[in-house]
Amino acid sequence: MIRGARAAVFTVALALSARPASAQQGGVIPLPARIIPGSGTFQLNAATVMQVPHGDANALSAARYLAELWKRSNGLTLAVSATAAGNEADARIAFRSEPGFGPEAYRLEVAPKRITVSATTGAGLFYGAVTLWQLLPPGRNAAPIPAQTIVDQPRYVWRGLLLDSSRHFQSPAFVRSMIDWMAWHKLNVLHWHLTDDQGWRLQIRRYPRLTSVGSWRIPASVPGSPAPQPYGGFYTQDDVRGIVAFAAKRHVLIVPEIDMPGHATAAIAAYPALGAGDDASLPVSAKWGVHSHLFNLEPGTFEFLQNVLGEILQLFPSRYIHIGGDEAVKDEWNASRAVQARARRLGIHDPDALQSYFTQKIGRYLRAHGRRAVGWDEIMQPGLTSDAVVMSWHGASVARAAAIRGNDTVLAPDPMLYFDHRQSSLPGEPPGRLASISLEDVYRFEPHDSQLTDIQQRHVLGLQAELWTEHISSGRRVEWMALPRAAALAEVGWSSPQRSWPDFLKRLASMSARYRAFDLDYADSVFGIDARLARTAGAIGVTLSNLTELKDAGLDSAIRYTLDGQEPNASSMLYAAPLKVAAGTEIRAATFLGADQVSRTWSVRLDGHAGVRRSSHELELCSNGVGLLLEPDGNSGSTEAPLAVDIMNPCWIYRDVDLAHGPQVLAAVAALPFNYELGLDAAKIRAGDNQTPDGELEVHVDGCDTAAFSVLPLAAAAHHDGVTVLPAQKLPPIAGRHDLCLRFARPSLDPLWALDWVEIGD
């Protein structure tokens, strides 16, 4: 749990003692602060006794959680018993409370006859138990554990993840599961984003329309298609109480966020009198992006917000309450006579100062009830009180400014810790932001700011990654986008800054096995297979690699493959150089560390399309506006591969095409709903230059501004859901090899046309 308002810091001696020690710690993530090797081993097996002192509730809770983890991940069943001093068994695991440790610190001693976990707090004992769990290799119910002493404590007190339950709703069972795997990584803050323009997800008894109306939206659809079913859901207060209690047992603090004054469309749709605009029939939004709907400044609106917060304070014991404050577009405030009249009465002439007034008023209410306001960094305006916590999403410079002025701050930078970005360029990534934020990017993020004094640095509480869910439509996808990047985040927030990327990868292989044991749908991108196909005379060239240079990291890595459709194993053929494979062959490949498979199996049957068909992932985007991976049918939960598109400029480059023999072009396209709130930027998008009623896919040669070389009409796809293959078009012959530009000419912004794949061949 978060204790007080200062970051925990390592002593110099402890920080200097931190070092990778894979032989002793097996697969522990995050890496402990100090590991001292011992002599001999402790033989852990089903006969081991787990003991706690009579009456020590913290020790009993930690021991029971450890027993539960080992049973679920390793099939090892150990009994937990309370024992009076002097009655300890010889071969035992003992938990004991001792004074003198920090709030989350612990000591774990492994000796040949006993293991002892010591700490002052329940959190310390819990984290000692989690570390001990990870010392047993995954999948084994008995093993020798090397003797060692681990002395450990976190670097930062705030090590968090944001879960956006507004854009897409997750079940209470999933939220509990997420809290569980957060605890395995010693992540201790769940920032729960419960309200936004697209849905209000928390039951407020005094205002039932917040959930009867505000929690439901009609999803966006392509013009002319059948109306979708309403989408939504909400958490009852009983749900929340159960989740909060579950989290407390795992020492995860839940910080609720109720967004204000912006991101308020769902609340205003439920109670129109709260809004600053004139639209009394505003729906809950199905559009992504920044909306202009703000709460107004009437006394009744502040009464509403305080009543809502009053119920929230009864549900969440957290000292911290997040009030949003980001992206509050002031257009409605500026246009509202009522808002402007109130601003004049308050003597406020600047819209940002008006938001500062709003923030201060809410902050005073929370302070009067013993809580602290947390807000996105837009709240950092003159008049911000020193007890407010600034969550910096605009980067280190904003966090630095907050710390210098004396405000506590949490680093949550976009894009580095925005986990709605895909993890790699591999084709198996789910929908999300197109730009990649890799596992290594997260691991190499350094929160320490050398420009701050030691006193100022103590205002940096820690760091947090964000799981915005506009395009993350299910709990399984949340797992993929979070894991294993959450493991890297945990190590940055807990361990010494002297971290080792190669050592982390070795430990991650063990952690990945634990993910599989708990059926978590984690991304294996760091170990995944990057395959390139090229058609050659009489065969298909296959080049395999890893995006991560595993051998350069000192790992015993290998790619192994089969050509008979069988699953690869540690004895399969070793990939050493590009292959030439006959058409019709099914090739399967996977990455191994030693004898252990660490990636999912990549497979493909080399049919007539291999080497000539390129997906939107394999093409280059013509521009870098708002690049997204989108579901091909525009709906949540599609099983088809997402489409890579820049929504500001749907345009792709197909490089190095031989046009000498006049090949044909075959393309698969999809019409998607254009559900983006872009404000004035929407005017920058090209539309209205179509030659046929439904538009065309244009093919240009050596540049996108040349005259169209060929045109594929969209009529065949205009009224179809999902992906449609357009009729093939023969390209005129031109000597040499050329780059092709493919872009859409469309009558309007909606629908958004996207390319699934294109094939250039005979």
What are these model-predicted stretches?
Residues 272, 284-286, 290-386, 393-401:
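Active-site neighborhood of glycoside hydrolase catalytic domains
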Residues 100-306, 310-320, 361, 365, ...:
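Feature activates predominantly on carbohydrate-active enzymes
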Residues 51, 94, 505-635, 673-679:
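Short, compositionally stereotyped local motifs that mark structural "simplifiers"
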Residues 373-388, 394-541:
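Flexible, acidic glycine-rich loops studded with aromatic residues
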Residues 8-17:
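Bacterial N-terminal signal peptides
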Residues 1-9:
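Bacterial N-terminal signal peptides that target proteins for export
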